[in-house]
């Protein structure tokens, strides 16, 4: 199958990011042009190191640029308590000499977009700091963005605070800017990613697939205590799945605002499902997932990975 969708992936690996990067690299429908890193699950130095380790593991020459070390206006609150101090605890990667590009992520994204023959798809599976910096410094790039597909937000409960999902809560100001930007946005939030559970039986079959399966199995063992007994939610992988199998998702056009001021609600995505605010829709929000179809797709895409 010929790759037809050219993408840029902005990520903060992170254990579940590793599975999403694998899918972005090896799904035959996708052509990954650039990876950029951002502070989120752990510091940007660690997310960059982790992404380079993964590229070395797969012997990939995809260029990688290091991005923002802190949110736009706030100190970083990471998720090392979930992913481990390094961000990818549980597997011993081979040493390498790879380095990121000399330019920061938002400039690297600009360069790829402006040199592309047609608009490209951005995929963001971490905080939206790099995307906001791109739009702040180079607003003309918006014309070269086909759409932004993001993992983040929620129409209901959060997973970082009672109301806020982690990726949005880390940098609410960046997310607010992005949702106000006029970009075509597909939001894969907790409403679908909490459904994207891989069963213990599926996880235990990973080592027999290939070396990537062995690596992911080791990482998932450290994702959360007991996760191999209860299953693992593949939050970030949902954004990649939508690119390849959009029919698995039920979307609704909604107005989405990001709360930046609330003492208890900062980082909340206000998803106006019923149109009560009278604002025009600015996002396609994924609200339901064909779970069986998602699991079948995951099994198929992992079979492409070496």
UniProtKB/Swiss-Prot annotation:
Top EC category: hydrolase
Which InterPro entries does this UniProt record tie to the protein?
Inosine/uridine_hydrolase_dom, IUNH, Nucleosid_hydro_RihC_nonspecif, Ribo_hydro-like
Please give the Gene Ontology molecular function terms for this protein.
purine nucleosidase activity
UniProt key word Hydrolase? yes
The biological processes this protein is annotated with in GO are:
purine nucleobase metabolic process; purine nucleoside catabolic process; pyrimidine nucleobase metabolic process
Superkingdom of origin: Bacteria
* Record keywords, A-Z: Glycosidase, Hydrolase
Identify the Gene3D superfamilies for this entry: Ribonucleoside hydrolase-like
Query: HAMAP family given for it?
Result: Nucleosid_hydro_RihC
Q: Which family does it belong to?
A: Belongs to the IUNH family. RihC subfamily.
Kindly provide the name given to this protein in its UniProt entry.
Answer: Non-specific ribonucleoside hydrolase RihC
Q: What taxonomic lineage is listed for the species of origin? A: Bacteria, Pseudomonadati, Pseudomonadota, Gammaproteobacteria, Enterobacterales
């Amino acid at each position: 199958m010929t790759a037809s969708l050219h993408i840029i992936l902005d990520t903060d690996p992170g254990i579940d990011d590793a599975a999403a990067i694998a899918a972005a690299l090896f799904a035959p429908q996708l052509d990954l042009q650039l990876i950029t890193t951002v502070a989120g699950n752990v510091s940007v130095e660690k997310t960059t190191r982790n992404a380079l380790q993964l590229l070395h593991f797969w012997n990939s020459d995809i260029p990688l640029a290091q991005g923002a070390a802190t949110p736009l206006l706030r100190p970083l609150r990471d998720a090392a308590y979930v992913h481990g101090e390094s961000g990818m605890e549980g597997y011993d990667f081979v040493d390498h000499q790879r380095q990121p590009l000399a330019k920061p992520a938002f400039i690297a994204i600009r360069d790829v977009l402006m040199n592309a023959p047609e608009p490209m798809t951005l995929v963001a599976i971490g905080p939206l700091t790099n995307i906001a910096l791109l739009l702040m410094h180079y607003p003309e790039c918006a014309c070269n963005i086909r759409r932004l597909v993001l993992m983040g937000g929620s129409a209901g409960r959060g997973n970082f605070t009672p109301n806020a999902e982690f990726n949005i809560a880390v940098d609410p100001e960046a997310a607010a800017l992005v949702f106000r930007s006029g970009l075509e946005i597909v939001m894969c939030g907790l409403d679908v990613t909490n459904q994207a559970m891989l069963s213990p039986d599926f996880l235990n079959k990973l080592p027999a697939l290939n070396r990537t399966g062995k690596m992911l199995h080791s990482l998932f063992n450290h994702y959360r205590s007991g996760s191999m007994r209860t299953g693992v939610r593949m939050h970030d992988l949902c954004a990649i799945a939508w690119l390849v199998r959009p029919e698995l998702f039920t979307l609704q056009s909604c107005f989405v605002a990001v709360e930046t001021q609330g003492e208890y609600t900062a980082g909340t995505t206000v998803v106006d499902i019923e149109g009560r605010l009278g604002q025009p829709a600015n996002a396609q929000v994924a609200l339901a997932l064909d779970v069986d179809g998602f699991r079948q797709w995951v099994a198929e895409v992992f079979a492409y990975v070496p």
